[in-house]
Design a protein with these regions (language model features):
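Short, polar/acidic, helix-capping and beta-turn segments at strand->helix junctions
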Residues: 1-127
Length: 127
């Protein structure tokens, strides 16, 4: 946290400490599974935001921006649909304050061979 902004990097969809299903979307991972994992990434990120807010006697004011990474082959064109799951999660949690600008990037490989990952910045406000 710096100047009431939380910087979260590299949120993977870990379950019981590790990424359960690995590989590229449409090769080893279905779009449905990628969407499920994207929601888990968002849930983990939101949990970290809640901890940061509590530790700083604040509440989560808004999501400032979101970066979504999808590991897939070069022909796959559905990365925005997968990213929508994270965006929807934050909007459901924070209402209009969950709306955010977003970048969505397709890559050939992510850490731990995860299919999806997110980074974000969020603002906190003193209670």
């Amino acid at each position: 946290v710096h100047n009431n902004v939380v910087y979260l990097a590299g949120q993977l969809a870990k379950e019981n400490g590790f990424v359960k299903n690995v590989g590229r979307v449409t090769e080893q991972i279905s779009v449905i599974e990628a969407e499920r994992q994207m929601k888990i990434c968002a849930q983990h990120a939101f949990s970290w935001l809640e901890i940061a807010a509590k530790d700083n006697n604040c509440y989560i004011e808004s999501i400032l921006d979101l970066k979504v990474y999808v590991s897939c082959d070069k022909e796959f064109d559905g990365i925005s649909k997968i990213a929508d799951k994270a965006s929807e999660f934050f909007i459901n949690k924070l209402g209009d304050n969950g709306r955010h600008p977003r970048s969505v990037l397709a890559l050939t490989r992510l850490p731990q061979n995860a299919p999806v990952m997110i980074d974000l910045r969020a603002s906190l406000k003193l209670k």
